Each structure stands twice: as C-alpha cells, then as structure tokens.
UniProtKB/Swiss-Prot annotation:
It is found in: Cytoplasm. This is Phosphoribosylformylglycinamidine synthase subunit PurQ. InterPro entries: Class_I_gatase-like (IPR029062), PRibForGlyAmidine_synth_PurQ (IPR010075). Keywords: ATP-binding, Cytoplasm, Glutamine amidotransferase, Hydrolase, Ligase, Nucleotide-binding, Purine biosynthesis. It comes from Methanococcus maripaludis (strain C7 / ATCC BAA-1331). GO terms for cellular component: cytoplasm.
Length: 272
C-alpha cells in the first residue's frame, strides 16, 4: 500500500515565531509542510482545503495585545472562519501549541458534545504567579479520545508562557472529563498529579490541565512545546545522561520518541 504523506499548513504572521521548528518536526515525522502567512490565506493565494493538517504554532501573535491569541483569532473569525469550519467538517486535523492553543481557544475550536464549533468553552489566563515561565515540565496523557496521543503516557517538555492557566467552569470540566477530552495534565516525573501545586503545575491551571481536544478527538491544543524538544540533546542534563549511557555501553537515541510521537500519530491518522 502506498503511504499517504499529509500536507501541513503551518500558520505564520504577526508575531508567531515557532513556525520553523514546528515545520521541521512535522517533516521528521513524515509530513510535507508549507509555512503560510495568514494574509496569503485571506488573499486566496493559499487554501486551507489543499492541506490535511492545520498547525497553529507558538509565539506572541500581535504581542499578546488585547490578550494572548485574541487578535489573531479575531483576524481568522473575520476572514477565514467559514473555510476553517469546512476544514473541520471534512474530517481533517488541527493542532495548536502555546500561542496556537490560545488562538484556538479564542476561536472556540474545542467543541463539546453539547456545543458547536465557534462557541468558546474555556480560557487561558495569566499564570497565578504573574511570571513568565520558561523551563521543562512533565505532563501525562489521560487516556483521551485524541488522535494525536496514541501510545503516549508521560512526556518531558519545555514551557514558555505567561498566560497558560487553563480555566473553565465546573459543568464544562465535567463534560470534558466525561467525553475524555482532557488530553494532558501536569504531573511529576512518575505521573503523579501536580494537584495544582507549583512548580509541577507551572501556571495554576484548573484541574492541572495542560491540553484538551475537541469532541471528535481531531483538534488538539496544549501549552507545552513538544516541537522544541524533538532531539534528546535539547533535554536538561543531556550531557550527564549521555555519559551515564556511555559507561553502560548504551547510546542515547537521537529523538525523544514520546515527543515526536504526537506528530507521527498525525501522519499515521491518514494511513489507517
């Protein structure tokens, strides 16, 4: 059987700044990528329908003015939302990381069984310590319906955000939980819940939530950056781990497999 190589539209423009490493990670996972400025979509030079995956990367779109991800989301709402809904209804995939998650939250892409796309169900607010957090954390997959996280348990990933505190009301939380839409939660290295305690939970996120998906499992957003932790050499204490492995006659793998697996799962979705 001929393997399908999905095309990824990596969104760019107005302060998004993680498009290069995000495109690189998808390429290593087996996809083709185009970095596309949002204005080229609005002008019709590029079309969402020509792609299988839309990627909203991290960054600081519009400098986080009017709130993180808000202005970029409004640009999409006012110019591209019909195209985006058509893309969703065609059964394709959407992923958002950090600022991309914030944009998608403002767009209302994380529909519940009781809501439709375009209805906002949650928020990503300022970290409780009012500080920009830039370090590594552990997150655990919650046996969700998300297609991006098949075979993933605990992963070690960097964060870089000042507004990452997930919030929703109790009714929404219960529906997310019931429908297995809570994808990642903050934890310790053994997978024990952070219980909203700092520094395991870096931003005070309600219920330790680091990432969620929509009711179909095809649309995911998360605050941590797996695309920035593709290679083992990027991990903290890499040199120490390398030396220990050397003394044991072992070799550290090139990739952090659990992190690239998110992107491989997206590619494999089109080869079922």
């Amino acid at each position: 059987m001929i393997k399908v190589v999905p095309k990824v539209l990596v969104m760019s423009g107005y302060g998004i700044n993680c498009e290069t490493e995000t495109a690189h990670t998808f390429q290593k996972a087996g996809a083709k990528t185009d970095i596309v400025h949002i204005n080229d979509l609005i002008a019709g030079k590029k079309k969402m329908a020509d792609y299988e995956i839309i990627m909203f990367p991290g960054g600081f779109s519009y400098g986080d003015d009017t709130g993180s991800g808000n202005a970029f989301a409004n640009k999409i709402k006012n110019n591209l939302f019909d195209d985006l809904k058509e893309f969703i209804n065609s059964g394709k995939l959407i992923l958002g990381i950090c600022n991309g998650f914030q944009v998608m939250t403002n767009l209302g892409l994380f529909a519940l069984p009781s809501t439709d796309y375009g209805e906002r169900i949650s928020a990503l607010e300022a970290n409780t310590n009012n500080r920009y957090e830039c370090r590594w954390v552990h997150i655990k997959e919650n046996e969700s319906i998300c297609v991006f996280t098949k075979g993933i348990d605990i992963i070690h990933v960097p964060i870089a955000h000042g507004e990452g505190r997930f919030y929703c009301d109790e009714k929404t939380y219960l529906e997310l939980k019931e429908n297995k839409q809570i994808v990642f939660t903050y934890c310790d290295s053994e997978g024990n819940p952070a219980n909203k305690e700092y520094p395991l939970n870096p931003n005070g996120a309600y219920y330790d939530i680091a990432g969620i998906c929509d009711k179909s499992g095809r649309i995911m957003g998360l605050m941590p950056h797996p695309e920035r932790s593709l290679y083992s050499i990027s991990e903290p204490e890499y040199q120490l781990k390398k030396e220990i492995a050397k003394r044991n006659g072992e070799i550290i793998p090139e990739f952090i497999e659990s992190n690239i697996q998110i992107f491989k799962n997206a590619v494999e979705y089109f080869n079922k």
